[in-house]
Amino acid sequence: MVRNKRVPHIRGTVEEAVRLARRWGADEVLARRAGILHDCTKYWELEPHLEVCDKYGVELDELERKAVKLLHSKSGACIAREVFGEPEEVFQAIFWHTTGKADMTLLEKILYIADYMEPCRKFDGVDYMRKLAYTDLDKAMLLGVNMTIEDMRERGVPIHANTLGAYNWLVEHGVTLEE
């Protein structure tokens, strides 16, 4: 299901998700399972993603129908639930780990952030995110969502409405990146 080069990222995401779950009082077993399966369909071609989403009743917007990078979270969540029997919490965490959304659960935030900052990730700001993730999870979320939005704008790529929704929700609930 995944390529060998992806294994270190998956392991890193699992380890980070478990550490974050322990820090924030979430279910470590569910965090581990979500981390293991979060990229299980990452390397599929477009058509299998669409088929799985259609089979399991996942409604896709126009942007998702064209973007494999967005689709892997939706199809991966379906495989986690329907093939591996994972519970709804794991399904939802995997489902939202790419775009984020407004009003995310603790497990959803943990997987989103663990995937973003696992030890193999190297980019400007990742060390600050790693610090924030253990002191203020919502600030870490805002940083990640903000970095995604900036990256998409710089590359001229459409920003998914759910990513903007995550950003707006956090800001509307008083989360800032100010010290």
Protein language model regions, located:
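Divalent metal-dependent catalytic cores for phosphoryl transfer on phosphate-bearing substrates
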Residues: 1, 9, 23-143
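Charged phosphate-binding loop/patch that engages nucleotide di/tri-phosphates or the phosphate backbone
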Residues: 150-179
